[in-house]
UniProtKB/Swiss-Prot annotation:
SUPFAM superfamilies: Ankyrin repeat
UniProt cross-references to PANTHER family, sorted A to Z: ANKYRIN REPEAT DOMAIN-CONTAINING PROTEIN 39-RELATED
Domain of life: Archaea
SMART domains linked to this entry: ANK
Stated name of the protein: Putative ankyrin repeat protein TV1425
Organism: Thermoplasma volcanium (strain ATCC 51530 / DSM 4299 / JCM 9571 / NBRC 15438 / GSS1)
Residue windows of the ANK repeats: 31-60, 64-93, 97-126, 130-159
Keywords: ANK repeat, Repeat
Length: 189
């Protein structure tokens, strides 16, 4: 059995976790992921409480800088994200590229997750290492409803990334017509 198959067996339920506490305590796979990260990736919601209770590694990072919350978001595991935030995960944590959970939810088009993260305090003006804000990311990917929500919440419409592009300029470059209409309406108001 490969290492990830082995870890899945060891975290599949509370009994398995209890039997393997010593093994799980310091376990990392070849990508430096903890058992909690693997559970978040695979949607093993029943394992989350027990893993957090025993190991409290909410902010540990893998080789890309992703935390358990970022893995839950990347895999659209809303229930798990909710559980992690209730246990103290940082809604504004960043991976090594500077992307936050909100940025990842926008990139993947997980609107419900994006709204959830915003309701739980995600920073609308945070920046990744390219200088992009969530508004620039949403504009670039054509996420018009999220663009509207970010503007409602006070996202900086004039923010520029490291190349000098604003959210509106990004929308134009990527041909995001719905987003361009939103910025046109904002200018008219």
């Amino acid at each position: 059995m490969d290492k990830n198959g082995e870890i899945v067996e060891k975290i599949k339920d509370e009994k398995s976790i209890n039997q393997n506490l010593d093994f799980l305590r310091n376990y990392r796979d070849s990508y430096n992921r903890t058992p909690l990260m693997v559970a978040c990736m695979l949607g093993m919601e029943n394992a989350i409480d027990k893993l957090v209770e025993n190991f409290d590694k909410l902010e540990d990072k893998d080789i890309e800088g992703s935390t358990a919350l970022i893995w839950a978001v990347k895999n659209n595991r809303l229930g798990i994200a909710e559980k992690l935030l209730s246990k103290g995960s940082n809604v504004n944590t960043k991976d090594f590229s500077g992307k936050t959970p909100l940025m990842w939810s926008i990139i993947f088009g997980y609107s419900e997750m994006s709204y959830f993260l915003l309701e739980h305090g995600a920073n609308v003006n945070d920046r990744n290492l390219e200088g992009e804000t969530p508004l620039i990311v949403a504009s670039k990917y054509g996420r018009s409803e999220i663009v509207k929500k970010l503007l409602e919440l006070g996202a900086d419409i004039s923010a520029r990334d490291l190349t000098g592009l604003t959210a509106e300029a990004s929308a134009r470059i990527f041909g995001r017509q719905e987003v361009i209409k939103i910025f046109t309406e904002v200018r008219r108001a």
